Amino acid sequence: MTMHLNDLKPADGARTERTRVGRGIGSGLGKTCGRGHKGSFARKGGGKIKAGFEGGQTPMQRRLPKIGFRSKMARDSAEVLSYQLDKLEAGEIDFAALRAANLVPSRAKKAKIVLKGELSKKFVLKGVAATAGAKAAIEAAGGSVEE
């Protein structure tokens, strides 16, 4: 027996008919159509509530006080770690040299050297701030800090 295109049919359970709601009590999905009585889920567009909405209660983000701020000083200044300095060639280092070595972002207007790691080269810092620990490490390596 040969098979024809009109003999093809989908596998059992592969295609189901769309459930029709609101078509009488006998269907099991009449009247309220499976949505229950009242409430947001019974309404059209129901269940779509804003993030943070707590049903009319003052939401958490309004109950808690504002804290902190973003310093404008931090935006204009940059930190350079002492072990990053060690990757540069020994000698004079100023703000322009740090920027040329990509150790300082372009938005920064000033930089500060912070101690982290060890210094083995002799550096002379000019016009760049340094913490007390970084200053001591630079001087211990034979360098100096000129503000």
Swiss-Prot record:
Tell me the Gene Ontology biological-process terms attached to this UniProt entry: translation
Give UniProt keywords alphabetically.
Ribonucleoprotein, Ribosomal protein, RNA-binding, rRNA-binding
Bias (Basic and acidic residues) occurs at 1-20
What are the start and end residues of every segment in region (Disordered)? 1-64
Cross-referenced PANTHER family: 50S RIBOSOMAL PROTEIN L15 (PTHR12934), LARGE RIBOSOMAL SUBUNIT PROTEIN UL15M (PTHR12934:SF11)
Pfam families, per database record: Ribosomal_L27A
Family membership noted in the UniProt record: Belongs to the universal ribosomal protein uL15 family.
Give the multimer and partner information.
Part of the 50S ribosomal subunit.
List where Basic residues composition bias occurs.
34-47
**Where does the record place Gly residues bias?**
23-33
Protein's recorded name: Large ribosomal subunit protein uL15
- Recorded GO MF terms: rRNA binding; structural constituent of ribosome
